[in-house]
């Protein structure tokens, strides 16, 4: 196959993909040859082979852009639930995009202006917000599960993934097995790393499940998981139960550390 360079394709990104190997294998079977081990080649070849909706095949968190010189199009992609941010704006007829608004502000001629609607949301429902709305005027957001296509005179917004609701018909046993598989698959895919892996263990259900799966995975590979936990100074004296947090976290952290062999690091005297 023609290389991505000869096809006039370019890619800038901020992403972590968890199925790069699977995609590369499928593309090799279709005749593509890789000259590097980076996921950039995988992304560009997948775009060439499957078209703009290739993003549906990606498993991971990402925000990236592809320039297709043959079509004179720029495509901006964002992951399904918006883990990686991606913003864009127009200044004097020029398209700007970045993973943070402050990068847009560095462009000559861009003047940041606070959005009153955005400020109302910050004060009323922060840290939550309406998807796509921010505190700056003229700073737009690529929505989760969307990609945008920009050409010389047009812009189009496409949804490639969305939540859907359907009646739950599985038995209790089937549900347990399905949820267990999805959790284990999600965590173990993300354990592949060239730097040490750790978890933030708060004592809640989410972090405890992630820690349990990660710990077992690392034990199978002869390694020990690093965990980090914290508690506030005098929290044992001043903690008050509420609907959001009926109990302190620290006792559950200790239960997890007693049950699983990890390298724990605890900060128990932080000031609020």
Predicted regions and their residues:
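Cysteine-centered catalytic environments shared across enzyme families
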Residues: 1, 7, 11-267
């Amino acid at each position: 196959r023609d290389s991505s360079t000869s096809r006039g394709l370019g890619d800038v990104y901020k992403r972590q993909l968890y199925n790069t190997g699977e995609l590369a294998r499928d593309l090799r079977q279709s005749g593509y040859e890789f000259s590097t081990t980076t996921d950039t080649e995988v992304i560009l070849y997948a775009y060439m082979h499957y078209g703009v909706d290739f993003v549906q095949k990606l498993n991971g968190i990402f925000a990236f852009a592809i320039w297709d010189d043959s079509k004179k199009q720029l495509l901006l992609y964002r992951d399904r639930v918006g883990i990686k941010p991606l913003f864009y704006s127009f200044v004097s007829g020029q398209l700007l995009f970045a993973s943070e608004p402050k990068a847009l502000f560095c462009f000559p001629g861009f003047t940041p202006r606070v959005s009153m609607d955005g400020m109302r949301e910050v004060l009323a429902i922060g840290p939550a917000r309406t998807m796509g709305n921010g505190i700056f005027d003229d700073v737009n957001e690529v929505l989760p599960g969307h990609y945008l296509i920009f050409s010389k005179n047009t812009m189009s917004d496409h949804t490639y993934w969305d939540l859907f609701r359907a009646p739950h018909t599985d038995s209790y046993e089937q549900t347990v097995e399905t949820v267990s598989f999805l959790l284990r698959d999600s965590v173990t895919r993300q354990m592949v790393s060239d730097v040490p892996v750790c978890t933030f263990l708060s004592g809640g259900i989410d972090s405890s499940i992630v820690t349990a799966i990660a710990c077992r995975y690392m034990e199978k590979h002869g390694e020990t998981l690093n965990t980090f936990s914290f508690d506030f100074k005098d929290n044992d004296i001043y903690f008050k139960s509420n609907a959001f947090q009926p109990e302190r976290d620290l006792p559950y952290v200790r239960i997890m550390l007693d049950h699983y062999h990890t390298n724990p690091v605890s900060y128990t005297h932080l000031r609020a």
